[in-house]
């Protein structure tokens, strides 16, 4: 049986990833971590481990211990913040499918540009410099609806599908 570690397993991305694994024909032993003890109750994992945040000095030692103690075959770090930290560790290269850390970014626009430059299909993206630019951006991108997103954050934080530039303006303000 393959053993998988899903970090950030209590967030919506982690929960959905675990659900996808459970829906497959294959049986997996899944260890889930999350820094939020309450979110850790959401995913259908076999083992739950409350972890410190990715920025805590104890995060990496704990991940290494989990990998060793549970004979983990594959690590799926769910939030981008944890993926970035784990991608920098050479001992985990064979246990993840993460790209080089230079491709990962906390900035969604940088990620979009890196993906585009590496021939991955991505949506057209514009950076808003001023609220007064909203109508022209909507026109340039086909009139809407458009996703309005913050450049940083996970889990769809500060994102909304807006039908008009007026709706986007109200969302931003």
Predicted region positions:
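Extreme N-terminal starter segment of soluble prokaryotic enzymes
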Residues: 1-4
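N-terminal Rossmann NAD(P)H-binding glycine-rich loop of SDR-like oxidoreductase domains
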Residues: 10
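Surface-exposed amphipathic alpha-helices with a cationic face
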Residues: 14-25, 67, 87-90
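Conserved beta-strand positions in the Rossmann-like core of class I SAM-dependent methyltransferases
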Residues: 29-31
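Residues in the short beta-alpha loop(s) of Rossmann-like NAD(P)-binding domains
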Residues: 34-36
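Conserved N-proximal alpha/beta basic substrate-recognition cap immediately N-terminal to
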Residues: 42-127, 136
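Active-site nucleotide/adenylate-binding loops and adjacent lid/helix of ATP-dependent enzymes
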Residues: 102-173
């Amino acid at each position: 049986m393959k053993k998988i570690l899903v970090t950030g397993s209590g967030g919506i991305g982690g929960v959905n990833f675990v659900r996808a694994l459970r829906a497959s024909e294959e049986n997996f032993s899944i260890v889930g971590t999350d820094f939020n003890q309450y979110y850790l109750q959401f995913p259908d994992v076999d083992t739950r481990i409350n972890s410190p945040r990715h920025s805590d000095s104890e995060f990496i030692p704990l991940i290494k211990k989990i990998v060793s103690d549970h004979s983990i075959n594959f690590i799926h770090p769910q939030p981008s913040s944890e993926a970035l930290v784990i991608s920098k560790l050479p001992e985990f290269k064979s246990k993840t499918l993460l790209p080089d850390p230079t491709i990962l970014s906390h900035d969604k626009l940088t990620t979009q540009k890196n993906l585009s430059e590496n021939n991955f299909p991505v949506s057209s993206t514009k950076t808003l410099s001023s609220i007064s630019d909203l109508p022209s951006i909507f026109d340039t991108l086909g009139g809407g609806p458009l996703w309005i997103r913050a450049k940083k954050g996970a889990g769809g934080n500060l994102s909304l599908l807006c039908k008009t530039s007026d709706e986007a303006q109200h969302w931003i303000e």
